[in-house]
Amino acid sequence: MLDNAEELSMDTPYGAPSDTITLGGIGGRRLAFIPRHGKKHNIAPHKINYRANIWALQKLGVSRVVAPSAVGSLREELAPGRFVVPSQFLDFTRTREGSFSEDGRVIHISVAEPFCPELRTVLLDAAGDAHDGGTYACIEGPRFSTRAESALFRAAGADIIGMTMVPECQLSREAQMCYASVSTVTDYDAWAEKAVTAKEVLATLADNVERTKALLAKLIPTIPRDRKCTCADALAEAEF
């Protein structure tokens, strides 16, 4: 998918990223790709070294993060195979390192609007029929929800459910990088009559891999070279 692709191994103050980083180009634009679960999908969501991944991208000069993900649907109208570009998240994670605050540094980052509006707009234009907006409930994983939990998430206003957006999104904001996500619905969560299985998720993902690649190939050349959002100044009012 990438022109002139090369693999780069990096170390960070937080340990190693999930895997080697692929550097390459699409449509004349340079980019870096980190498979958050590892190339062999051998890292569980709660074990991903999110800080190392985001630190590495920032060190490489990345200014924007487009994050594909697989999600379950909490709404009947968001059927499997649908793209969703969420606008909010709910954090139900418990054990993850969610900030670069350390060694006396305290970052009170604002995530009132957690996704870059400029990047979301370009992503929606490229995606065409993607669902615009919605709340992503991020759970700890790797297990799926109970029916009671799924009902709770629906009652709380969540529209989709996944395991990786938090703390990836807020770390990107602390790193002053734009962040937007395109989520592929793979299943209806446990609230539906038939409970989700890993086999079902993988089958739907496999059916949509090429669609996601095509979307990224269309999107990346259209991203403005200069940022007009405020993401690059996210720390200005976040520290005392």
Curated annotation (Swiss-Prot):
Keyword field contains Transcription: no
Pathways involved: Amino-acid biosynthesis; L-methionine biosynthesis via salvage pathway; S-methyl-5-thio-alpha-D-ribose 1-phosphate from S-methyl-5'-thioadenosine (phosphorylase route): step 1/1
InterPro entries the record matches: MTAP, Nucleoside_phosphorylase_d, Nucleoside_phosphorylase_sf, Purine_phosphorylase-2_CS
Keywords per UniProt: Glycosyltransferase, Purine salvage, Transferase
Positions bound to phosphate: 36-37, 69-70, 164
Annotated catalysed reactions: S-methyl-5'-thioadenosine + phosphate = 5-(methylsulfanyl)-alpha-D-ribose 1-phosphate + adenine
GO CC, one annotated term: cytosol
Enzyme Commission number(s) from the entry: 2.4.2.28
Quaternary structure and interacting proteins, as annotated: Homohexamer. Dimer of a homotrimer.
Protein family per UniProt: Belongs to the PNP/MTAP phosphorylase family. MTAP subfamily.
Known role: Catalyzes the reversible phosphorylation of S-methyl-5'-thioadenosine (MTA) to adenine and 5-methylthioribose-1-phosphate. Involved in the breakdown of MTA, a major by-product of polyamine biosynthesis. Responsible for the first step in the methionine salvage pathway after MTA has been generated from S-adenosylmethionine. Has broad substrate specificity with 6-aminopurine nucleosides as preferred substrates.
PANTHER family to which the protein is assigned, alphabetical: S-METHYL-5'-THIOADENOSINE PHOSPHORYLASE (PTHR42679:SF3)
Protein name as catalogued: S-methyl-5'-thioadenosine phosphorylase
Originating species: Cenarchaeum symbiosum (strain A)
Gene: mtnP
